């Protein structure tokens, strides 16, 4: 399988998926990004067993699936061509190449976990503010999220602390 995409798209995939890669060596396939290519698009998925991300970018490839590891990307580039060579994967950045060992195993199934059902409530948040609020609870094992109303945001509750995260207005 051969996948060609813009360098910026590839770099964005690496950045977005890295926090969703498993740190555990028990299931090496969860330390990869699944690239599912069809109809001129690539859906990059990463799952560590607890959280999942899907990220869609344009590409040029035959329909198919390839699992790739996180790699260090060059600082500059215009395009990347990813080639599956049975036991290795080649990343050709035009100015340089990287060849890595292919991780054995069947690609993890990500379809259907993130539903396309119509939501009962939709709330918009500034991701930086949301992260800042959650960072205050990193010492907790569990954080409860209480949603009162889409205009009132939600309340994060820990053992002995709570935080209010206000929403961003969404046009309907």
Predicted regions and their residues:
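DNA polymerase processivity clamps
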Residues: 1-172
